[in-house]
Amino acid sequence: MTAPLEALVLDVDGVLTDGGIILDSGGRESKRFHARDGVGIRLALLVGWRVLFLTARGSIPVKNRAQELGAEWAIGIGRKELFLEEWLEGMGIPWERAAFVGDDLQDLAVMRRVGWPIAVADGVDEVKAVAKLITTRPGGRGAVREAVEWLLDRAGLREEAVRRFLAQEDGFSVGKPEQ
């Protein structure tokens, strides 16, 4: 890596999910997230990277998933580049020390500015054209984990991230099934 990474910014629909939007009869939205992507996000956080979920859609499931993993979130953001400019500036992080994983046209402005633009395998051609990495996995199917591992490898931090991950308490509870 030319500059140490400080922030990992993730689009949601098409990156953390497969892009499908599920609405029940009451208009409530559900999303499906991949467990391996969650581990990748935790690995990024364990090496001190800020992780932000950035999406144009307003979505309670996105907020819940971000909170569960310890990531930050910004939902209902129409102009991602303007929001991210303020967010990075507020953190004192230059654009070249940020990575962004995207999949569609609304991600292009941000991808052209960050130091580490990444496209998912099933992203549109315009996004792939500006990416330093095109994942082999599609959005919602482990693409974020692949991107995080690639970034960790380039920073020489993968082994340390895995060590820290394995050293954590697992947080599981044990009980007996009801008889």
What do the predicted segments below correspond to?
Residues M1-L82, Q179:
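Alpha-helical substrate-recognition element adjacent to the catalytic core
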Residues G27-H34, L69-A74, E81-Q179:
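Mg2+-dependent phosphoryl-transfer enzymes with acidic/Ser/Thr/Gly-rich catalytic loops
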